């Protein structure tokens, strides 16, 4: 039996890299520039096929708007965001950034991409939690 190999889109790769960098930023509190540089150096081969301008925009703009993003998320979380798994928090922050500021990206795409990224990086059931939270946030941002 042959396995179907899925080609990952450059934007999905950008989101995955942005989540990894947001996670590093939240854990280390190093500067975004330092995190990005170290990531690119460490992941040189993995950066092929990444929409680099979109990756940089997602990573830096999510950090620039983190207070707004966190206050947008807070009413829809079942716990404080500091109690969230750091990967779940990074995925949610990125998705809320896209829902709130990247209006050219359909909300269904944002939610689906967040779920798919959670399946790669999150805990076993985290994609379900991410989906539930984003399904509540999207209508509140008039994205449904």
Swiss-Prot record:
One of its GO terms (cellular component) is cytosol. Pfam families: NusB (PF01029). Keywords: RNA-binding, Transcription, Transcription antitermination, Transcription regulation. Coiled coil: none annotated. CDD domains: Terminator_NusB. GO terms for molecular function: RNA binding. The keyword Transcription regulation applies. Transmembrane segments: none annotated. One of its GO terms (biological process) is DNA-templated transcription termination. The keyword RNA-binding applies. Belongs to the NusB family. Involved in transcription antitermination. Required for transcription of ribosomal RNA (rRNA) genes. Binds specifically to the boxA antiterminator sequence of the ribosomal RNA (rrn) operons. PANTHER family: ANTITERMINATION NUSB DOMAIN-CONTAINING PROTEIN (PTHR11078:SF3), N UTILIZATION SUBSTANCE PROTEIN B-RELATED (PTHR11078). HAMAP family: NusB. NCBIfam families: nusB (TIGR01951). This is Transcription antitermination protein NusB. It comes from Histophilus somni (strain 2336) (Haemophilus somnus). The lineage of its organism: Bacteria, Pseudomonadati, Pseudomonadota, Gammaproteobacteria, Pasteurellales.
């Amino acid at each position: 039996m042959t396995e179907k190999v899925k080609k990952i889109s450059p934007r999905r790769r950008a989101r995955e890299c942005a989540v990894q960098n947001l996670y590093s930023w939240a854990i280390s509190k190093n500067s975004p520039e330092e995190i990005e540089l170290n990531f690119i150096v460490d992941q040189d081969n993995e950066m092929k096929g990444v929409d680099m301008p979109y990756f940089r925009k997602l990573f830096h703009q999510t950090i620039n708007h983190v207070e707004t993003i966190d206050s947008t998320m807070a009413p829809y979380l079942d716990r404080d965001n500091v109690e969230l798994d750091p990967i779940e928090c990074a995925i949610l922050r990125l998705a809320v950034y896209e829902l709130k500021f990247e209006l050219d990206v359909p909300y269904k795409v944002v939610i689906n991409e967040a779920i798919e990224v959670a399946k790669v990086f999150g805990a076993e059931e985290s994609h379900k939690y991410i989906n539930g939270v984003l399904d509540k946030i999207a209508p509140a941002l008039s994205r449904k």
